[in-house]
Swiss-Prot record:
Protein name listed in UniProt: Proline-rich protein 23A3
Similarity field: Belongs to the PRR23 family.
Phylogenetic placement of the source organism: Eukaryota, Metazoa, Chordata, Craniata, Vertebrata
Domain of life: Eukaryota
Extent of Pro residues compositional bias: 214-241
Positions of the UniProt region annotated as Disordered: 1-50, 161-196, 212-254
InterPro entries in the cross-refs: PRR23 (IPR018903)
Encoding gene (name): Prr23a3
Biased composition (Basic residues): 243-254
Organism: Mus musculus
Low complexity biased stretches: 35-50
């Protein structure tokens, strides 16, 4: 049997540690579920900012007036024949334009153009006034531009068609200062129709263009020898027969 030896008594017995109780933890605060505050109702756009004033243009014939019912009262508006009448009523601006100022063409003054074919109409828009340019101004402007362009093209063509006097006797190329290698009798004349694109014309042009420049060290290349149609090309060697291919096995899965 196994026996255990009793512990020997000592002067200083080992202290006996007793488990200490943990200190009470601070009480946790309860989180109260707070509902989000209700957002304030959005103010209506009409209350936030006043609406922009609206502008209307009315064209009146000579001797006519505009009648507007306002709070049970009929308001009669008649502009002078030589001026524009502007009236503001409850955030609405009305421009009364006489018929005489509708087609104003004075320099520095805008001309009012009516939209309706009758010549008198009203149009609502955010602009303070409506300005329109007549079609005659645009037509005249574009016509002058086209005439200037055509004159410039004619001058350019006349300059090339009639060379200066110092160049009329000699032959010059398109590059200024470089004489042309073509003599007067070699210069090809203008041709029309199929002659311009015929092979003979192209061949003569190539020969003339290959002429050497005077004083140039470069020499033209010799012409390529013409191939005789009677010459036969050497027969091609017979192709070697191909080796037979090996049979391939294919697996078919059902």
């Amino acid at each position: 049997m196994l026996r255990t030896r009793p512990r020997s008594p000592s002067a200083d017995p080992a202290p006996c540690w007793s488990p200490q109780t943990p200190a009470p933890s601070p009480a946790k605060r309860r989180r109260l579920h707070q509902e989000p505050a209700c957002p304030e109702p959005l103010a209506q756009p009409e209350l936030e900012a006043p609406a922009e004033p609206t502008t209307s243009v009315v064209f009146l014939a000579a001797g006519s007036a505009l009648q507007l019912p306002l709070d049970g009262v009929d308001l009669l508006l008649e502009p002078e024949p030589t001026s524009v009448l502007q009236v503001s009523l409850q955030g609405h601006t009305i421009l009364l334009v006489p018929e005489g100022l509708q087609d104003s063409t004075h320099f520095g003054q805008p001309g009012f153009v009516a939209i309706s074919p009758q010549g008198a109409a009203a149009q609502d828009g955010p602009q303070d006034h409506l300005v329109g340019l007549q079609e005659e101004t645009f037509c005249e402007y574009f016509y002058q531009e086209d005439v200037c362009d055509e004159d410039a093209d004619l001058e350019f063509l006349e300059h090339w068609a009639s060379p200066p006097d110092d160049q009329a006797n000699g032959n010059f190329s398109s590059i200024p200062g470089v004489p042309s290698p073509l003599s007067q009798d070699q210069v090809p004349g203008p041709s029309t129709g199929a002659e311009q694109y015929s092979p003979r014309f192209i061949w003569e042009l190539d020969i003339n263009m290959l002429g050497p420049f005077p004083g140039s060290p470069l020499q033209p290349l010799p012409p390529s020898p013409s191939r005789n149609p009677q010459e036969q090309l050497p027969p091609c060697p017979p192709c070697s027969p191909r080796a037979p291919r090996r049979a391939r096995k294919r697996l078919v899965y059902e």
